[in-house]
Amino acid sequence: MGKKKRSASSSRWLNEHFSDQFVQKAHKQKLRSRAYFKIDEIQQTDKLFKQGMTVVDLGAAPGGWSQYVVSQIGGKGRVIACDILEMDPIVGVDFLQGDFRDENVLNALLARVGEDKVDVVMSDMAPNFSGMPSVDIPRAMYLVELALDMCKQVLASKGSFVVKVFQGEGFDEYLREIRSLFDVVKVRKPEASRGRSREVYIVATGYKG
């Protein structure tokens, strides 16, 4: 039986992926993913991470963000990461594999955080996309709402939140909610984010909790 022919959209994505300068740079530098460059650009602009911080990384696999943050917070810092997918170990990262939407996984994650509040919550979570915005955007918004709920539980006063959000229905309301909870809120589109993608990154600092 012959191989199943790829759709035009998946073939285009693969061509874009392997010709992408950030994919090539990540491979050359032995980085986990091109997402490393997105969080690096955000750090250069917004200065979120400092030595000794505790950071929660949601949607962490394959580990690009965690890998970057470990280099910024040093040996006395902590990264607590979670993803439904497997992730190869990273020194300095406490990784929990499981579905963040599951209450048992959430409780296990909260137990790893412990009693102390964290300095930064970051989320690069995204659903499996169907290609139908009417389905995909609500799924994506559900995940970012969960990430914000996590902030409300674990983020220290004056802490920071960075979250990937897909522009569409619910985006403006979500942005308004974040602005009510943080002193300074910016919407970033890093150079390493594909131009055709609806994704942007909300960077919020000065949590009022």
From Swiss-Prot:
Please give the Pfam families that the UniProt record associates with this protein.
FtsJ
Spell out the GO cellular component terms annotated for this protein, sorted alphabetically and separated by semicolons: cytoplasm
Coiled-coil stretches are none
GO MF terms, alphabetically ordered? rRNA (uridine-2'-O-)-methyltransferase activity
Recite the UniProt keywords alphabetically: Cytoplasm, Methyltransferase, rRNA processing, S-adenosyl-L-methionine, Transferase
Top class in the EC scheme:
transferase
Which SUPFAM superfamilies does the protein's record reference?
Answer: S-adenosyl-L-methionine-dependent methyltransferases (SSF53335)
Q: Which domain of life is it from?
A: Bacteria
- HAMAP family per the record? RNA_methyltr_E (MF_01547)
| Name of the protein described by the UniProt record | Ribosomal RNA large subunit methyltransferase E
**Whose protein is this, by species?**
Haemophilus influenzae (strain ATCC 51907 / DSM 11121 / KW20 / Rd)
